[in-house]
Amino acid sequence: MCTQTPARLTRGFPLALTAFATLLSIVEPAVSGAQDTRLDPRDTTHSQKQAPFFTKKDAILAGSFVAATVLMFPLDKQAAHALQDSSTQTNRFLKHTTTDVEIITSPGAYIIGGALYAVGRLGKWDRMADLGWHGTEAVLFAQGVTTVLKGAVGRGRPFLSDGTDPGDYHPGKGFSQADYTSFPSGHTSTAFAAAAAVTNETTRWWPRSVWIVGPLMYGGATAVGLSRMYHNRHWGSDVLLGAAIGTFSGRKVVQYAHGHPNNRLDRIMLRTTVVPDGRGGVSVGTSIPLP
């Protein structure tokens, strides 16, 4: 009886994570929106009085992620076994879907972000350029944090032990061996960074979109995390911490960018001019702000 309880709990992990992400998709951008009510939602060209960069609500959100990650550690093995069950692994729909969502995330996040930025600059659609650039910034920041942690922690990926040893840590080994870069999940942090950036960016100028964009973006990000577990590349706790890093990266990049519209990167990237050169090409011009 006792040995079956963890299994029952972990079989429900995908549903629990999906429910958590759905709640996050609504609550998290609403929190950001409440902090930004005094901001001009249209662009980053006007500086206004800001709420504190980190708030009590941020602390609650971070604490929830940390608690979920810590609680997941003892259940990592059972969750891995549940998703590696033969009936799950032979499901054709899951096989194709999990592969597709991973490709959309990496390298898809960079391609989509870059395309939105380029189209926004070419068409002089500032909101689209903001969306593409800030989304890409968030993904890059999340990846930077994730990469350092992966290398430092050196946690073995589940397939090394056939999902039996979630405690396989070799600090520093992740910098030299990819098989020891399990914690946290890079695909998940990328997906949640993009989800948070897009959701928070769009709710600045379309507040009601939180009920549409939020569930779509965070739901997709959750699918990415579950796909990494399905492919036996990550433990459940890897996914949860990756989600935390990505969520905060997306939130804070957007908040900082709109709170500091004259920051150097935005002045360069969002004030670049792209015009036809008369020869079938384009001419790109920008100004480099001096210190």
What are these regions (language model features)?
Residues A68-A80:
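Alpha-helical transmembrane segments of multi-pass membrane proteins
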Residues A79, Q84-T99:
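Active-site-surrounding "flap" and adjacent substrate/cofactor-binding loops of secreted or lumenal enzymes
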